């Protein structure tokens, strides 16, 4: 039986064969809408909701929402119970230290939470008022 030698594979081919892992960074914001004291309260979020870096003005876009309807639909908020929903945004710049959560809408009543301090996990809990 003939000896089989190990084939040489050029480095460019090896690189192409390696799995491509691209780290996707996202910012998760858990929002609390305080308990209303009456029935019939409605809530929704617009796609024009951003995280805005307080220094650079960079805008991170809303990419996902949980437990809240997206405009033009509404979500009913139960009375006497805090209502929680989650928003997921594209990443913030590395050097961002604080940011605002702002819903930019063509009417009154858009959400705004100012000066949220950046943390290492990029997971936040805020109160919407």
Locate each region found by the language model:
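Acidic/polar low-complexity flexible segments
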Residues: 110-129
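Short, well-ordered beta-strand segments enriched in hydrophobic/aromatic residues
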Residues: 25-36
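The feature marks short-to-medium sequence segments in extracytoplasmic or secretory-pathway proteins
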Residues: 36, 41-74, 78, 128
């Amino acid at each position: 039986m003939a000896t089989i030698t190990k084939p040489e594979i050029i480095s460019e081919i090896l690189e192409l064969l390696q799995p491509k892992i691209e780290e996707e960074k996202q910012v998760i914001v858990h929002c609390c809408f305080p308990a209303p004291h009456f029935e019939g309260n409605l809530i929704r979020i617009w796609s024009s909701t951003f995280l805005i870096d307080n220094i650079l003005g960079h805008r991170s876009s809303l990419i996902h929402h949980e437990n809240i309807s997206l405009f033009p639909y509404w979500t009913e908020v139960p009375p006497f119970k805090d209502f929680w929903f989650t928003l997921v945004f594209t990443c913030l710049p590395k050097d961002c230290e604080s940011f605002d959560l702002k819903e930019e809408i063509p009417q009154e009543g858009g959400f705004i939470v100012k000066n949220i301090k950046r943390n290492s996990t990029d997971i936040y809990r805020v109160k919407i008022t």
